[in-house]
C-alpha cells in the first residue's frame, strides 16, 4: 500500500496531490493513507506544502527530487 501511495504522489509531478486524491487513486478512504504519507515523509521521500489559508487550506504532497 505504501508503494501505491508513493506512486500516486510521484505521478502528480510538479502539481502535487491532495490526500483526498491519493485515497481516490488507491481506492481507499483517504484518511487511511495518512499513515503511509507520514512514513514517506519521515524517510525523506515526500514533503508537504500548505496551500491557502484558514478553513480553506489544504496540504499538497510532492516527491523530493535528488
Q: Language-model segments: what does each one mean?
A:
Residues 27, 41, 57-59:
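Short secondary-structure boundary/hinge segments and terminal tails
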Residues 27-39:
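Short amphipathic alpha-helical interaction segments
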Residues 49-66:
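Short, cationic-aromatic polyanion-contact patches
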Residues 9-13:
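Short helix-to-turn junction characteristic of helix-turn-helix DNA-binding domains
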Residues 1-6:
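Short, leucine-enriched amphipathic alpha-helices that occur as contiguous helical runs
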Residues 15-25:
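Short acidic, hydrophobic short linear motifs in intrinsically disordered regions
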Residues 41-51:
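A short, conserved structural fragment
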Amino acid at each position: 500500500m505504501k508503494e501505491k501511495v508513493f506512486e500516486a504522489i510521484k505521478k502528480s509531478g510538479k502539481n502535487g496531490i491532495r490526500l483526498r486524491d491519493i485515497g481516490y487513486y488507491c481506492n481507499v478512504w483517504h484518511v487511511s493513507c495518512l499513515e503511509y504519507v507520514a512514513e514517506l515523509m519521515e524517510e525523506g521521500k515526500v514533503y508537504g506544502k500548505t496551500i491557502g489559508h484558514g478553513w480553506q487550506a489544504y496540504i499538497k504532497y510532492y516527491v523530493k527530487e535528488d
